[in-house]
Amino acid sequence: MTGFEIVILVSLICVMAALYASVGHGGASGYLAIMALLGVSAALMRPSALILNVLVAALATIMFVRAGFFRWQLLWPFLITSIPCAFLAGAYSINEPTFKRLIAATLIIAAVRMFIPQRDAVIRPLPIPLAAVIGGLIGVLSGLVGIGGGILLTPLMILCRWATPREAAAVSAPFILLNSLAGLGGLLSIGFVVEPWLWWASAGAIVGGLIGSRWSIRSGSQLWLRRALGIVLLVAAFKFVITS
């Protein structure tokens, strides 16, 4: 990767991290989209996205906990199954065409998610057995693709009225953090490599994550940004579809 390409990559990662952190996400699906558009090899994408995810999700978790929005009782039913499933799936090696199709599907889901408005509603009790099943399924996808799973958990919690949008974001951040660490642990068991540009991308992700997390806590209109992000994700998904 040339110096100019690295500058472009880091800049885009920073912007993506800010956008995702503003809704309590780590941004792995966005990082995968950026790497796809810049032609990063599939072998590098999964570990790179997970590492960036850990950094941004950690910042978002700290911000939401300090702001008092985090609720442990909404998190643990998903975690008890998602962490082991993410670890096992992370250790599983899949062929490149299958990997690309899984990422394309994930990006499409993420894009659709960006166009769904967030509304407060009457909150229902969280059914623990169902949450455990959902957590396991999200964990498998997280480990296989290289995401934290928040892009799936957040809309589900809101649509099922298990949490307000802000509570869902506050729960998704640590969920993403721990799932990403589990996925990385699984990958580590089979070995992976990272490129030098990842350290610059990590710095960009940290800066973007700080900006986005602060913006989320202080609130602000995110609708047009979310829709623009949805379009970017759809473009990246299309690229994965035609190259798989």
What is the meaning of each model-derived region?
Residues 1-22, 26, 30-42, 59-141, ...:
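Juxtamembrane transmembrane-helix boundary motif
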Residues 42-47, 169, 173:
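Small-residue hotspots at the loop-to-helix junctions and early N-terminal turns
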Residues 48-63:
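Transmembrane alpha-helices of multi-pass small-molecule transport proteins
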Residues 49-53, 172-176, 198-202:
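Short hydrophobic/aromatic, small-residue-rich stretches within specific transmembrane helices
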Residues 167-184:
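Hydrophobic alpha-helical transmembrane segments of multi-pass integral membrane proteins
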